[in-house]
Amino acid sequence: MSNATPMVRQYQELKAQHPGTLLFFRLGDFYELFFDDAVTGARELQITLTARHKERGDPIPMCGVPHHSAANYIAKLVRKGYRVAICEQTESPSKAKKLVRREVVRIVTPGTPIDPQLLEPRESVYLAAVCAQGETVGAAFLDISTGEFRATQSSGRDAWERIVADIESYAPRELIFPQALSALVRAGFRNEQKTGTLPLARDGMSDNLQIVDEGNMATTDDKLKFVGLPFTLTALDDWLWQTEDCAALLIKQFGVRSLDGYGLTNKHEAVRAAGACLRYAQETQRAAAAHIGDIVYFEPQDQLILDQITVRNLELVEAMGGASRSLLDVIDETVTGMGARLLRSWLLRPSIRRGEIEARHGAVAELYASHIKRDHLRSLLKEVADVERLTGRLNLGSATPRDLVALRRSLDQVPSIRDLLANGESSLLQVLNDAADELADVRALIANAIEDDPPAKVIDGGVIRAGHSTELDELRSLSRDAKQMI
């Protein structure tokens, strides 16, 4: 468009850097979509499609949503399989010399959600990765909202089938894989509901990643579905899966010298899958994701593999036909989202290690035998927020002041929980008690710095307690008493 305004050119440049996404472009109090993105957004969100620059005879399709409710619109698009690039104004309009600087600060994909609108409190949301070399297949599973990170590897003629069963058991929202593996992946998951591609390519000027345009959303030729939940297929450029680069990325993330302590020695395909998973998460979040602090390697024989047909027929997590309740519905008496997600994972991926099973039974038996201790423990846990996801939002820079207060109130329960479990006989309860850190310094810092009832957003002010920061107190005084001082 030769006569494009500076703002439109800025949009086009950012869009060119992030093809394969719908670009939410911040303009004042709205996020705007232009050109083909606007047509798609208006159709999928059922909002009005209008046009910009009609008077010039070359109208630009556009639609928009208010920034304060954008999360709900983004959630609708991501649930449909779209990927959304969020572009923010990164300088104040009053300070901008000409055009306000804007940058893409995050890409929301089906497998990397952190916003509450895209998360179920009692279910994990996994990004999965799969790769293969010969008869060895590796896979990794990452819940970026909590930092849970797992990897596995299988070898032999039936390795692919075993890994596919693992992937089905995790029910990821998104599966990434090397482009070279596209035919095998699409054949293996041809019964699913929707697919998509978001390949990343190396920028010729740097080591940053660029998204290669293969469309905003998938075609519907292939079908992807597990227990009623569709997931998206995402092909990534093959260079992202180099073993040495993936290992180096994981080592840097975990702050270690080698991956031997994680059971990943000579597990090259597991390392490749995990490294690609981590890189994809970091690139979409535009953050280091420091809450992803370790990884658990598991052997296929460590757990019972239940394929999707078995899970459905046994009604483990979803009832069939006229049944009103699944097995999970019947037994789930957990009082925290963290406990609910753990119970669900135990049902879908049962351990077959005798020691682990007996330890769980011992802990349950002890609490079952003492209803006083059990009821007291449940009352304490009811005061605990979803600390896993709270810390995830903190590390990804999306936490609110109220999240900090919720974290402090949750940590306030830890000393009482430890006291309650201190004299337990169960080996598992003892291990949990010994591992629990009361984080007294963190609790004290939040209590001293943050108001008990802060506003929802930092920008609203009134978050930091008076007296915590001398500099802030002086600035508040200047703001409050400016007229008198003048």
Q: What is each of the regions a protein language model found here?
A:
Residues 369-373:
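Conserved interaction-surface patches within small, structured recognition/assembly domains
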Residues 1-366, 379-382, 386-395, 399-485:
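Charged catalytic and DNA/RNA-contacting regions of genome-maintenance
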